[in-house]
Regions:
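N-terminal pre-domain/capping segments
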Residues: 1-109
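Active-site groove signature of glycoside hydrolases
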Residues: 102-122
Length: 122
């Protein structure tokens, strides 16, 4: 059975927090969500204006929070331009940490991107 899920980034233009995004998703009866992983800390997210989650957050506490709302994480957005000039320096570590976080959270998938531009010869 195919089930619909939403990315918390849908509420980014409204400067909503992760918690506010989860409340909106749960309110319409959707059970699955995706969120962006933040590698480190983000000032805007700490103020409650970004619906992403820091990879330094406690995944078990996050899982308990989502369980109470009846939500499951279907995928974590660990997007970094892997084929860009900093892909090997930063992207690999970022995605590796996102995979670890997903495993601790019980999330089955992580996504990333190759980059914004076509790499010559690829």
């Amino acid at each position: 059975m195919i089930e619909l899920g939403l990315h918390t980034d849908n509420w980014r233009p409204l400067s909503m927090s992760f918690e506010a995004s989860c409340a909106k998703i749960a309110a319409v009866g959707i059970k699955h969500l995706e969120f962006a992983a933040i590698h480190g800390q983000n000032f805007i997210q700490a103020l409650g204006y970004d619906p992403g989650i820091s990879l330094q957050a406690n995944p078990l506490a996050l899982r308990r929070y989502l369980d109470k709302k009846g939500l499951k994480v279907s995928q974590i957005d660990g997007s970094y331009p892997m084929m860009g000039p900093n892909g090997s320096a930063f992207g690999v570590q970022y995605v590796t940490q996102t995979i670890r976080f997903a495993a601790e959270l019980g999330c089955p998938m992580v996504d990333t991107v190759d980059g914004a531009f076509e790499t010559p010869g690829m």
